[in-house]
């Protein structure tokens, strides 16, 4: 049997994964996949190790992990495959597939256009009520936003590694 796992980034906001969960449900309904699970790399769970274990316990011998990311950043290039390789050691009988991320697809152009059109009735950002930041505490040592200075960014853009 085959399982599909949609693997997202994760968030401190409990509702953040609901859209991905809806996508998983629709994949099952529309295409008949017997098992489509959702998990996250970090923050609130469920996390990949426990989700993979669930699939294995249900007898899946092939698990396809689809990274639910738009861009091939560090998580796609290193973090996720590294995490998957570590977990794969526990289940030598299971074929663990690292699938394609969302990346570019012509259907995304239509989706972005839909969002642009739907934004016509949106409020000016200054009118949006914000929840208190204290509601979403930041773990020690982590920042809300980590910008890269232009010189450092130029090095990464030039050779792709920053080394």
Briefly describe each language-model feature range.
Residues 1-163:
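Extended amphipathic ligand-handling, pore-lining, and cofactor/metal-binding catalytic surfaces
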């Amino acid at each position: 049997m085959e399982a599909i796992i949609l693997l997202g980034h994760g968030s401190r906001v409990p509702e953040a994964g609901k859209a991905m969960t809806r996508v998983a449900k629709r994949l099952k309904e529309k295409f008949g996949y017997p098992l489509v699970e959702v998990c996250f790399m970090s923050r609130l769970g469920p996390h990949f190790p426990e989700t993979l274990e669930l699939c294995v316990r249900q007898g899946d011998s092939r698990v396809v992990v689809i990274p639910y990311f738009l861009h091939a950043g560090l998580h796609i290039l290193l973090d996720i495959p590294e995490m998957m390789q570590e977990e794969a050691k526990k289940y030598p009988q299971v074929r663990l597939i690292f699938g394609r991320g969302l990346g570019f697809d012509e259907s995304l152009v239509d989706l972005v256009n839909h969002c642009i059109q739907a934004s016509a009735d949106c409020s000016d950002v200054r009118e949006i009520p914000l929840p208190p930041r204290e509601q979403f505490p930041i773990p020690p040592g982590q920042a809300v936003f980590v910008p890269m200075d232009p010189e450092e960014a130029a090095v990464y853009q030039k050779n792709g590694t920053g080394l």
